[in-house]
Amino acid sequence: MNPLLSFKDVSKGFEDVQILNEINIDIEPSYFYTLLGPSGCGKTTILKLIAGFEYPDSGDIIYKDKPIGKMPPNKRKVNTVFQDYALFPHLNVFDNIAYGLKLKKLSKSEIKRKVTEALQLVKLSGYEHRQIQGMSGGQKQRVAIARAIVNEPEILLLDESLSALDLKLRTEMQYLLRELQSRLGITFIFVTHDQEEALALSDYIFVMKDGKIQQFGTPIDIYDEPVNRFVADFIGESNIVHGTMVEDFVVNIYGQNFDCVDMGIKENKKVEVVIRPEDISLVSQNDGLFKAKVDSMLFRGVHYEICCKDRKGYEWVIQSTKKANVGSEVGLYFEPEAIHIMVPGETEEEFDKRIESYEDYHHA
């Protein structure tokens, strides 16, 4: 089956600044996708190109096997929820949601039915006659989403839609968005710079930097198997250290050999090693793979964040449910599966091949 939407070598610049560089992506129907990256990486530009608010300088955008790169926005089965909601302040909730339906000249009874259903979906039943000015940020966000889904788009675009909400409201909206996407079966494309939000919401994530896709995959794939230092550092907390590949399943870190689960890398190849803080355990000095001294400890609510320095002066961050005494000597332990090897300069295609060969080896 062909993708619902594809970018084919799409580039876009503004004046002398290149924003997107030969972007290639495929969007399948009925999934929740997230474009994740820092400010200025090009993620919102991709959203604007999908919506038709901008046109590509080169390459093309294919929707259901037809090029739409130059198609005007009103001809696309796409709706957008903006960061600032873009609601009409002089219209009440009902009229805001009904606006697009009235333009389509639907009957009053059909409009009322659709608006009522949309309000039920976003859990705002009974709010039809409320004025926009008197609503909270979370309520305005729900109205904006209802206005988008009432038009039954095939793709719903969400541009940093939760960033203005406080933590509790943002969490509630995350649950609502996932519930809506599952129930309606609409393809969602969500833009955010918030890594936790992307991991929680998405079926698939595009990680972006400097106008290029760094990695594409499921949240678990990207978290567990980052393709490069940027992805590893951007997605969650990481201990990233230099190492040398001794042979398949053995890596040398700072002069000490460790068992790992990576293979297919040349012997003596310089690599970068990622170990997540939650994968490191504090143990007795005798039980540790190496020894370290506790430098500091912060309470983060669900865990303690403990910073240690090993005897060679390298720092390690550990997330533990157990306290540690600052200044104490401890052992650090992690399983071979906790070690992830990254090869500097390796492309995503090369990385994927290496991971596949490792999986084939273990299934043989």
Curated annotation (Swiss-Prot):
Catalysed reaction equations from the record: ATP + H2O + polyamine-[polyamine-binding protein]Side 1 = ADP + phosphate + polyamineSide 2 + [polyamine-binding protein]Side 1
Domain ABC transporter: 5-235
Bilayer disposition of the protein: Peripheral membrane protein
Subcellular location: Cell membrane
One term of GO molecular function: ABC-type putrescine transporter activity
Entry keyword Nucleotide-binding: yes
Residue runs in coiled coils: none
Top EC class of this enzyme: translocase
SMART domains (UniProt xref): AAA (SM00382)
Function: Part of the ABC transporter complex PotABCD involved in spermidine/putrescine import. Responsible for energy coupling to the transport system.
Complexes and interactors: The complex is composed of two ATP-binding proteins (PotA), two transmembrane proteins (PotB and PotC) and a solute-binding protein (PotD).
Family note: Belongs to the ABC transporter superfamily. Spermidine/putrescine importer (TC 3.A.1.11.1) family.
Enzyme nomenclature, EC number: 7.6.2.11
Keyword Thylakoid in annotation: no
Gene Ontology terms: cellular component: ATP-binding cassette (ABC) transporter complex
Keywords annotated in UniProt: ATP-binding, Cell membrane, Membrane, Nucleotide-binding, Translocase, Transport
Protein name, as recorded: Spermidine/putrescine import ATP-binding protein PotA
Protein residues bound to ATP: 37-44
